[in-house]
């Protein structure tokens, strides 16, 4: 059972992911802390601070996040008191350039 704080974190996370997929940059950023940081392990790119994360999302993610046939299957969701970790299996047809995941 999740605490109220943990449930609030999950709700914000779900809003964040929905905004990413919908291409809504402002809502995506509104779900983040005042000094967000984003680090994508596969390509070692991302951003730090509101301006850096905004630029990364604008140039690489929001509105061009995934091809139309993307499927996301949650493997696990671990929620602590101050962090949330989601493990996913993502599948899609590589029909366009996706710099942050598969460069070139």
Put a short name on every predicted segment.
Residues 1-104:
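C-terminal and inter-domain tail/linker signature
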